[in-house]
């Protein structure tokens, strides 16, 4: 029963994750130039939102089923549904990650090619940097302890991240579990410090993801610094 109450406690995290994708689509629509992503500036955000709609509907259906679940059979159906939702969510996150990487490569090429329009390049780079934070928050949330599909339905035995709240007087605190906001904070601090801060990666995959995020962030900040120096000189 304690595990299933954890599912209810973190129900809002699924909607925060869906909202994060919608925010990325909005940022792309408002700030990305058509030269950075293929096709019309409406194409990519539209694809993302079209993929987001069935994902949101499935999330709402699953949470509705969880509120009325009465036996293990119901929870088994919910678990299977959440696994399918997680796979589709990972696909959408990978798609957004690829597009952000393409945009970063395009901005880097323009900077190295001496492109004009310093203000535009700065806005593009900052947008890529912030989008990267959201993307990796989604990756961390989807990866830790087998992802949200297992949350509240299976015992968490091998976490991928060690949060400060998990340690109390040297002992693991089982009453606390991380939510999407916690993973967003981890992503933000990793992108600004270029290394872990108060939350440590434990698994190889978490270390690899944090390394990739820090590298992308370092390159993006380098673009901003290079453009600033160019403007000043």
Feature-to-residue mapping (PLM):
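Hydrophobic alpha-helical transmembrane segments of multi-pass integral membrane proteins
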Residues: 18-28, 48-55, 89-106, 127, ...
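Alpha-helical transmembrane segments and their membrane-interface junctions
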Residues: 28-29, 96-115, 180-198
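Membrane-helix interface/capping segments
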Residues: 58-85, 101-115, 145
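Membrane-proximal soluble regions of multi-pass membrane proteins
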Residues: 142-199
């Amino acid at each position: 029963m304690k595990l299933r109450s954890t599912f209810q406690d973190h129900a809002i995290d699924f909607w925060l994750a869906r909202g994060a994708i919608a925010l990325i689509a909005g940022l792309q629509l408002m700030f990305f130039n058509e030269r950075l992503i293929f096709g019309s500036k409406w194409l990519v955000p539209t694809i993302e939102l079209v993929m987001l709609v069935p994902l949101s509907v499935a999330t709402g259906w699953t949470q509705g089923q969880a509120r009325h679940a009465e036996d293990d059979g119901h929870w088994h159906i919910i678990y299977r549904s959440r696994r399918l939702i997680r796979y589709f969510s990972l696909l959408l996150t990978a798609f957004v990650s690829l597009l952000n990487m393409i945009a970063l490569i395009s901005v880097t090429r323009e900077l190295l090619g001496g492109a004009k329009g310093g203000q535009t390049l700065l806005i593009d780079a900052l947008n890529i940097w912030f989008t990267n934070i959201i993307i990796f928050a989604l990756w961390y949330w989807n990866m830790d302890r087998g992802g949200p599909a297992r949350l509240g339905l299976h015992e968490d035995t091998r976490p991928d991240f060690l949060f400060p709240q998990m340690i109390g007087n040297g002992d693991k605190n089982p009453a606390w579990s991380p939510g999407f906001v916690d993973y967003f904070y981890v992503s933000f601090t990793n992108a600004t410090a270029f290394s872990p801060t108060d939350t440590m990666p434990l698994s190889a995959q978490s270390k690899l993801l944090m390394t990739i995020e820090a590298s992308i962030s370092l390159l993006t900040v380098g673009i901003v610094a290079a453009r600033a120096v160019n403007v000043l000189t």
